[in-house]
Amino acid sequence: MLVTSTPSIEGKQIQTYLGIVMGSTVRARHLGTDILASLKNIVGGELKSYSILLSQARKEAMDRMIKSAEDMGADAVVNFRYETSTIAAAASEVIAYGTAIKFDD
């Protein structure tokens, strides 16, 4: 599935806009990870465990969005975006969304 952040795809003619598609996931941090991150905050540097967690969440959200687009019969997703929000003290939601389209044959 072709996914792009642009509103169109060079060399392709959009036939039909099928609608908005999205995928989301909520991930909770581990208490031990939070403690280690607090220590890392004091000395500085990348919080690798959080980076890995967010990377996995982005991939899961994107995979779910692509599945939704495939279920609609889409050829691609344009105007792709991510959004992240904190929904609890130790949990974050990642949403991937865009517009599912069909190409002219």
Where in this protein do the model-derived segments appear?
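N-terminal presequence-like segments and the immediate start of the first folded domain
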Residues: 1-33, 71-75, 92-105
